[in-house]
């Protein structure tokens, strides 16, 4: 295992959070040390994981569950963090805490490592809806987008152009054809697509 010193993170990173940015942190098998002022959690114990009941994110839209992955588990006590998800025994698993004018989200399992080492964990039936974590973390940013989408496997990026327009790029990350609707925010209209097609109601087929 490793000992993480989050308080020793690059000063520029925490300075940006202090000024209003959002930071997301997930834990693998390390034992966090000295990060309570940043994350709002106080580590209580660390042990090899013996309980594998799913984590429930009751504070996230859709109340998804995530696999209790990772070789070790750290039990925490919330000090000033808001608990958004818990393990089966009620121990904090997904939290958010204020840091200056910004926020720090913390996930107590290495969901990214799980996805990179588990074939089909993104798109097969019963795959964990971990995308809901990122949508929750990025909610404020997404609110300022010109378009919104529904399909988790559809990636959408926006790029400002000098003309005051935005270039929208949509990519299907699933192995099958995908149909979704790109809903425009007020004040935006579609121009002629550079590639592919967009229906009058924003429907795309990729």
Which residue stretches match the model-derived regions?
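A conserved amphipathic helix/loop scaffold
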Residues: 1-206
């Amino acid at each position: 295992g490793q000992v993480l010193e989050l308080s020793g993170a690059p000063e520029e990173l925490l300075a940006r959070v202090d000024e209003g940015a959002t930071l997301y942190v997930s834990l693998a098998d390390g034992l966090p040390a000295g990060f309570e002022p940043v994350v709002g959690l106080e580590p209580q114990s660390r042990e090899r994981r013996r309980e594998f009941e799913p984590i429930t994110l009751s504070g996230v839209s859709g109340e998804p569950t995530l696999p209790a992955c990772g070789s070790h588990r750290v039990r925490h006590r919330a000090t000033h963090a808001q608990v958004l998800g818990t393990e089966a025994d009620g121990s904090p698993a997904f939290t958010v805490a204020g840091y200056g004018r910004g926020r720090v989200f913390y996930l107590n399992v290495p969901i990214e490592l799980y996805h990179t080492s588990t074939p089909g964990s993104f798109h097969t039936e019963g795959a964990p809806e971990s995308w809901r974590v990122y949508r929750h973390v990025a909610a404020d940013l997404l609110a300022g987008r010109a378009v919104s989408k529904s399909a988790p496997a559809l990636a959408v990026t926006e790029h400002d152009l000098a003309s005051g327009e935005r270039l929208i790029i949509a990519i299907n990350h699933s192995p099958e054809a995908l149909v979704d609707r790109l809903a425009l925010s007020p004040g935006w209209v579609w121009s002629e697509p550079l590639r592919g097609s967009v229906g009058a109601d924003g429907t795309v087929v990729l």
